[in-house]
Amino acid sequence: MSSLLAFHAHPDDESVSTGVTLAKYADEGNRVVVATATDGSAGEIHNYDNPEELFPKLAEMRRKELEASLEALGVKEYEWMGFKYSGMMGTSENDDPDCFWRQNYFDPVGKLVDIIRKYKPDALITYDPFGGYGHPDHIQTHRIGTAAFFAASDLDKFPLKDSQEVWIPKRLYYSAWSKKRMQSRRQQMFDAGIISEEEFNRFNPIGSEHDDIDVEVDGTKYVEHKIKSMKAHRSQFKDDWWGFNIPDEFKEDFLGYENYILAFNRGSWSSETDLI
């Protein structure tokens, strides 16, 4: 049995960025673990009539949503790191000294090192240096995840605790969106009248160059798992969101493939379709 650890910024990122990947490897009998850095406590609230009353409980709500999401994906183990949500780039939340964006590296890296030593993953997934789309928490997750990948074997800075053992993950992956694939998908959806011009342009031209992608996981078998997982994050996705109503002829192509950049490889591993 192989093991995979996905380190994400917010509750719901595990679904959006890696949903079919996690479902696939869990279903195939591998140990799959999700570590979520922040509590999502400053996110939007959809589908509720009283969002102002719910904001004080948002972190608790989002943790429960995460648990339901992971159940939909078949993931049985997770770690809630509980750092404070940092808000979008350029907002006042970025200046909060308690937010994840403002944390010194040592504390969050140390927490993730403990998680790596606990679960002993063969591969670690996090984000690229831009964090996918420039969110402060995603950028910080990239930094912390990359640092912890190497720090897990650094006994000088991170001595072993209790019954811990040194663990060195074999591979580090950055979750990525192929710019070429995203543009093609959006164009198809726009031409079919499924998404608006605003949605079409929303993330354009975010993504990685297609030639930089090392692995494309085919999770078409698990598309419905991913949709159910995203729907579990009810406070974050409107019930009528177009992503829940993709016609069958587009659904597998749009949601069933997830891309990764192999950032570091200890050994001779080479695959264009498999992470572990």
Please provide the spans of the model-predicted regions.
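Active-site rim/loop-helix segments in enzyme catalytic domains that contact anionic ligands
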Residues: M1-Y119, A147, D154, I261-F264, ...
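Metal-dependent de-N-acetylase/amidase catalytic core
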Residues: M1-L5, E93-D98, R102-I276
